[in-house]
Amino acid sequence: MEDKKVLLSIKDLQVKFRVRGRILTAIRGVTLDIYENESIAIVGESGAGKSVFTKAFAGMLDSNGFIDQGDIIFNDAELSDTVVPLNSYAKKTIASTWEKLNEYSKLEYGSEVFLKMKALEQEKEEKMTLSEEEREKADAEIKELVIKRTELFNYKQTLDTSKEKAKIKETSAEISRLDGEIKALQKAKEEKIKAHKQAAMNDTAYNQAYDAKMAEYKKEYAGLTAKEITDETRKRNEILAKEIYLSVGRYKLRKKVRMIKKLHEAFKAAMERGVDLNDEQKRNGVFDQATFRVRYLDETPEQLHGTCIINLAKIQDPNDWGQIRGKKIATVFQDPMTSLNPIITIGKQITSVIMKHQDVSEVEARAQALELMEKVGIPNAEQRFDDYPFQYSGGMRQRIVIAIALSCRPKILICDEPTTALDVTIQAQILKLIKDLQKEYNYTIVFITHDLGVVANIADRVAVLYAGQIIEFANVEELFYDPRHPYTWALLSSLPQLAERCLLYTSDAADD
């Protein structure tokens, strides 16, 4: 893979879900590079995290799911290249931002003293509340009871109100008892905090020493932050001001103003704490608090030009996902009938996707749709263009789903068990179609499956997923002929060994 470009780089990815008052981890520290024009299979049992993993970089996590940590860097030159018009509003905004950054930069001179003041404030706050050990102990006791209460409440929801009244009454009483204990523990915690606070307020010697030290720090800080900044810092801030505008240039006016304000606050806080903004990683981190950073490259009198690192783990705006999902990363799901709208014609479903992501007329979209239908093997495409999904067989519906996925020529095609709901005789045809079209469209296949037989036919490399972790990663030949992990051995051993059974039967028959 050394000669191929990394298309998607996943580093230490963790995906979690909020479920019934708990946080559950579905993906645990996955690191993986996916290359251009390759076929990679993600295999594992049901519940291993295969679909969640791919949904994380397709922006399709359920509402209770979130990326807790990690990066998903998507390398796409077209999306990375950013051009923003340099109109009067842009010039005025950049000038205003530059002026503010120059003012904030004075705070960098006093960053060491600022951190000392914050540390002193933190020390006083800790003195006025529980120690870390006391807090952890109190929180652990409360959390244990809350978990018990949640489990009982969920259990109560499963009981039959007409047949299990006694159990419901007993469970309700236990829930009420736990509620009382939780309130008592919370009250005890609050009283301890009040006692600590009162003791700290009555400590006259400490308070006098604190006030004197804080006054000393404030005087020193005022002197340091009164200095003028250097020309080098001004030049840095000019570039930063342009990068801030480049980074929010794609938003509508109201959101643009809101995001600029958020970035101003983020940079002020960073300068107060002495963050080295000449360090690319640290600068990116400041931008990530609001949006991903667009790095300044050059400009003309009419426009600013920049480039960005697209970190899919940090994208929050639905409009940003609209530029990626479908257009750059497409998905073929397991059941074609649930992927298609039953009351809209096949042709309309394909053309609507084309028109959404491409600047084409309905006539041009129809021509593209017919061409795609022919390429995926739909006979008499012109006659079947206005048919509804129920008029197609399962295999034909899946071919249409593939056509929709490929309509915008994506860089990555995620195939989430696309043959599971199909007849065995159709599965091989769909797999062959996906591989054949890859040669023409040059997309990367990410194939999710629990069927190792499918892996052998379609994949170049295989990642074995277990409990949200990649426990083995190898090319197809190595995985089948030299598996290293016991779980991989078990998966391979679960395959039917028809040849061996036949041989044993023949041997027994010969002995007879």
Name each region found by the language model:
Residues 4-6, 79, 124, 306-309, ...:
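Short catalytic/signature loops enriched in Gly
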Residues 43-45:
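The feature captures the beta-strand-to-loop junction immediately N-terminal to the Walker
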Residues 48, 505-512:
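Conserved small/polar residues in nucleotide/adenosyl-binding loops
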Residues 407-411:
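A short, proline-enriched helix->beta-strand linker immediately N-terminal to the Walker B motif
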Residues 413-416:
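Catalytic Walker B motif of ABC-type/P-loop ATPase nucleotide-binding domains
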Residues 418, 422, 426-503:
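P-loop NTP-binding/switch modules centered on Walker-like glycine-rich loops
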